[in-house]
Curated annotation (Swiss-Prot):
Primary residence: nucleus
Gene name of the record: pax8
Protein known as: Paired box protein Pax-8
Region of interest called PAI subdomain, as start-end residue ranges on this chain: 21-77
Keywords attached to this entry: Developmental protein, DNA-binding, Nucleus, Paired box, Segmentation polarity protein, Transcription, Transcription regulation
GO cellular component, one term: nucleoplasm
Entries under SUPFAM superfamilies matching the protein: Homeodomain-like
GO MF, any single term: transcription cis-regulatory region binding
Region (RED subdomain): 96-144
GO biological process: one example: segment polarity determination
Subcellular location: Nucleus
Source species: Xenopus tropicalis
Amino acid sequence: ELITERGCSGPASNLNIGHGGLNQLGGAFVNGRPLPEVVRQRIVDLAHQGVRPCDISRQLRVSHGCVSKILGRYYETGSIRPGVIGGSKPKVATPKVVEKIGDYKRQNPTMFAWEIRDRLLAEGVCDNDTVPSVSSINRIIRTKVQQLFNLPMESCVKSLSPGQTLIPSSAVTPPESPHSDSLGSTYSISGLLGITQPGADGKRKLDDSDQESCRLSIDSQGSMGISRKQLRTEAYGHHPLDALECHFQRQHFPESYSSSTHSKTEQALYTLPLLNNAMDDGKSSLTSTNTTIGRNLSTHQGYSALSELSAFTIKQEASDSSSASSTPSSLCSPTFLDLQPISSGCSAPSFSAFSHPASVYGQFTSHMASGRDVVGSTLPGYPPHIPSGQGNYASSAIAGMVAAGGDYSGNAYSHGAYAAYGESWRFPSSSLLGSPYYYSSATRTAPPPTTAGAYDLL
């Protein structure tokens, strides 16, 4: 703060007439110059003696504002030295002060800035005028003290004892990567089993071949409809979209369409009348007695058929000898049985109604009926499955199909709540197994025959 006082005492001859003058109290002053150190000290002494500021101003011929400012600064900081208003303070971050702050911080890294300030004053490194503020100490710690910890390698080596050495990080061998060896990670399945994993080139080749096979399968489905490329957006790249489409276009079930590009398996075209003749011949060959229908696993062939407008496209695939394709409706013994080729006038190869292996559980009855009365697979204690539209079963016949057990009884119900209702509220038969609601569909209209219903006839 620049204190321009108008109460300078002294002979007028010592003042510059051009820059000075007399104040209202008759005291001489100089513009732009602070009050002399002697006058400042006299103001403080009179204040300690108990003289009022107004009396000090009259005695020393110094303005009242100057006396008040000097005394206020003295009571606050203990200093009577003049400052500069609006100017910069004298540099407090001297090399000596910075070194001391660094020493304190190294001795106690958790020391606060105000503790460092108090210690500087206590040890006499700084006085009240030269001690840095708390913000200045924090700035010194950030900019200067922390730079001492980031010393170059040469200075660090010089500070080490003769028995200590520094090893650069580049000289340390990093631990072996889990994917760096040919057997993969030690803790992975491939590593435990000793399976060699393909390298990056091998994986890239596999991915390329996989994508190529996916493209072939996508191209072969020309009748699938609108191309998926129309659904693409510019937010995705070309390769991620191809990979996603490849996984979605894969068929998880046996292929049910004919293709001219896929010539891996033999295909034959059978018309609907020819297939119906083969079905009729197959039904006529079945008898109502226990007939053992053998099979030859080495020559077993499975077929998958798809109904279109006027023709059946049946894809013939050679299946493995261990796979067993069986139809529950074509079994008459507990063993898995398939149909042999049928010798008839029309040269139609043998076929099974289902191309995929069907696992049948439970026990099969030895009762084989002709026509529609074909008994399917049943589970112990459960009613048999009767397709819709086949309601020619009597309650006694159905009761005979169900395995005997303690869960079901053929006797009439004698419960009081059941007997409370009239006969019109109950089923015609008092037995649960003879209920037409569950096991007879004669009173209901049969749905129109479909292609799947034609296979149920076998």
